[in-house]
């Protein structure tokens, strides 16, 4: 195996030259990547990797892209969680079809009464022979409408403190006991779903981690969610044209479609400056001051993303840079919307086909969507709590019910 980055790049280049064919389907190409170990080079050899240091991932993906081939595989949040938490039976069943894109996943954590406090969930799982029977409701579930499997948290023991009686399951989504309903938002999009489970069934062994100890696995997923949010998506520019690229673009478009309204679109500093110039507002000292503030926030966000990338390359578990990055993105989104609003004035609230609507109505959409950035993936308040406790060493918020069986807490 290559000892240096240069050797590694050469090895990858030789393999891609021998195996990349743009006429392949995306699934066929991913099968080759996964079989070779280049799909997830830092994963253990047993689990479709090369056993390389974490820094090798970015080197390999960069070199594959330089060879005009597709480097991205849909690792998602389930991939690293299952890899870390196991057990082997779950790894053997789910990791390969996850990496090839054969099976699509969604996250089933939040509930109507358990959002920021996910551990307060009330969805139940009761063992019935060789299956778990699931009853409850989840909410804010991205991609649940076309997912094959769900990362599900459910309560399996009510007579212990709330964090101790949770189990992390793999839920088959395509079954009679699972109903998915779109959730309409104030910006008129339905980017999320509600999922209702009525006597849904899960095989007994489809548990990530251990029964009643699913909170540790859930924390792993949430840490990866914050980190991946700072790292960005797949790079498809410069890829050889063909079926694989067309399918990869369609897949990326579908994944991005539910987020198309997200205020990251407003965080593009270049677009904000371009809009200010087009409206004759670029010389306004107040607007220039706010644009300067946006540029500062945006660069700080980029540096945080660089720290997240460095942490991953050095093999360090997800740390506070995920929460810092999440907060930075929220600040950038709000500031960008503020600048747009200052430039447009009251016209900014015009939407739809109104001929006076700025940016063809996109600005109104952004203004209505910005609050979501501070909520989705963990509220700003949750990120502040994480940083205060894990970075600054401040005491946790007092909880008079801590340590009591959750059954008593719910009835109190």
Question: Where do the language-model regions lie?
Answer:
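Short Gly/Pro-enriched turn/cap motifs at secondary-structure boundaries
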Residues: 72, 113-116, 140-143, 158-160, ...
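A structural signal for short hydrophobic beta-strand segments in well-ordered beta-sheet cores
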Residues: 123-126
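Amphipathic, small/basic residue-rich leader segments at the start of a protein or domain
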Residues: 1-75, 83, 90-97, 104, ...
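A short, Trp-centered hydrophobic/proline-enriched beta-strand micro-motif
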Residues: 101-109, 153
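C-terminal helix-coil-helix/basic helical segment that borders enzyme active sites and/or dimer interfaces
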Residues: 24, 277, 281-288, 299-355
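A short core secondary-structure module
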Residues: 130-131, 135-183, 193, 219
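Glycine-rich beta->alpha junctions and the first turn(s) of the following alpha-helix
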Residues: 178-299, 373, 409-412
